[in-house]
Amino acid sequence: GIPVIEDAAQSFGASYKGRKSCNLSSIGCTSFFPSKPLGCYGDGGAIFTSDDAIAQACREIRVHGQSKRYVHTRVGVGGRMDTLQCAIVLAKLERFDWEIAQRLQIGARYNQLLDEIGFKRVIQRTDRTSVYGQFTVLCADREAVQSAFQKAGIPTAVHYPVPLNEQPAYRHLCCPDCTPVSRA
């Protein structure tokens, strides 16, 4: 079959039905960009798989497509993390469980406060945990809410203002009916 790629860039450390993110499909991937749950100070990421052939292909793609030195068996990229970023991720990984616990505590408080003022938000089901890589809310007047939060010193962002199906590179591939949901 076709391998399923799980994008866990925002959810590294979360779980679904007792299984950790990056472990729910054929290939799991995450980002170590600074704003992510396990972020370094620069850029980086990781791919997880239990399939030996996929793992080998990923290793080759990561080093310009080389299967052995000076032999390029596929098209690849320079996709290696530098040692400083690796050291940062490894150090942060040692306290990652503590950080997740802190995120869960803060997320529960946000949920309580947002419920009190009537915001619509993502409801957390009992068979999964979030690490609150992003905290998404739905409101009638986004600009007014952002302005009020800004005045109170609370940062906000519209993280993906142009939906993927409207991006020029993908517009011809995607379903236009997706847009109303992504804009909600």
Predicted features along the sequence, with ranges:
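Histidine-centered beta-alpha loop that forms part of the nucleotide-sugar donor binding/catalytic region
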Residues: 9-10, 33, 43, 59-63, ...
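Short beta-strand-to-turn element immediately C-terminal to the catalytic PLP-Schiff-base lysine
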Residues: 22, 31, 45-51
